[in-house]
């Protein structure tokens, strides 16, 4: 089992670099930095991380092919690969409609866009001249002036078609989920995609990009996870809620509370223990270890400790290192 950790660049880059270095010292294998227009730039942040770490792999978790042209993405991640001495990974997904609506960007044909972007980015990174007349991605002899070496590409994927595509074309897949029920479905879709193109499914790094909250006091861990879980519930398809026995109307209640900024209601009872169980790896080190082993048995090969990580970030990073990574 590999271990990654997610940081959101709402914090200054040097603060994230401190946490990234600490994560490296605690045995984490990957640091993933989110990419949203309202936060600090992902590639600027990754540059700072590259210069302040030695061995941990660093990547976008995840960018998309709408806000940045694939040639620009290829140039950016190739630069990170060069600066970091070959430690860069690219996390790329379809993005989300709400963000693109706010930016005035049309979210068209995400499956075709993602597939074609990955093909183009691989060719750019390999130093090839790219000519492509795809459904959504088009180039006419564009080429980078330098080669990056090998940069693994991980797809952010949730739905069955995206998961199947990840099995076909990606080195890994980042799945926003944390429960075995969700991964039983996801692993099958990835396997289907891999076998469709004659790949060994074990070549794909199946990653649980999870809401993670750890503390020796389980109540503190649960409270820290509630707001993140609320956003997950509010954005979950009905099918996923039904899979976990969560009433579909809870999505509207929680969505309304988020829209009103009524976080007291979320902390007070709208986010139930059932929701925490379904959408977070949460609790004591022993609780978290049990869930991780359950996921490993299904076929998950990397765990990413995503927001909030724990009620106290530095303490949580050390706890994961000493009580989980060191014992796996």
Swiss-Prot record:
Gene3D superfamilies per record: Luciferase-like domain
Reaction(s) the record says it catalyses: 5-methyl-5,6,7,8-tetrahydromethanopterin + oxidized coenzyme F420-(gamma-L-Glu)(n) + H(+) = 5,10-methylenetetrahydromethanopterin + reduced coenzyme F420-(gamma-L-Glu)(n)
InterPro entries hit by this protein: F420-G6PD/mer, Luciferase-like_dom, Luciferase-like_sf, MeH4methanopterin_reductase
Highest taxon of source: Archaea
Organism: Methanosarcina acetivorans (strain ATCC 35395 / DSM 2834 / JCM 12185 / C2A)
Entry-linked HAMAP family: F420_mer
Entry GO MF terms: coenzyme F420-dependent N5,N10-methenyltetrahydromethanopterin reductase activity; oxidoreductase activity, acting on paired donors, with incorporation or reduction of molecular oxygen
Primary subcellular site in the record, as a coarse category: cytoplasm
GO BP, sorted A to Z: methanogenesis, from carbon dioxide; one-carbon metabolic process
EC numbers, comma separated: 1.5.98.2
A Pfam cross-reference name: Bac_luciferase
Name recorded for this polypeptide: 5,10-methylenetetrahydromethanopterin reductase
Described purpose of this protein according to its UniProt entry: Catalyzes the reversible reduction of methylene-H(4)MPT to methyl-H(4)MPT.
Lineage summary: Archaea, Methanobacteriati, Methanobacteriota, Stenosarchaea group, Methanomicrobia
Keywords per UniProt: Cytoplasm, Methanogenesis, One-carbon metabolism, Oxidoreductase
Family indicated by similarity: Belongs to the mer family.
Annotated compartments: Cytoplasm
CDD domains to which the protein is assigned, alphabetical: Tetrahydromethanopterin_reductase
Keyword Kinase: no
GO cellular component assignments: cytoplasm
Listed pathway(s): One-carbon metabolism; methanogenesis from CO(2); methyl-coenzyme M from 5,10-methylene-5,6,7,8-tetrahydromethanopterin: step 1/2
NCBIfam families reported in the protein's UniProt record: F420_mer (TIGR03555), PRK02271.1 (NF002619)
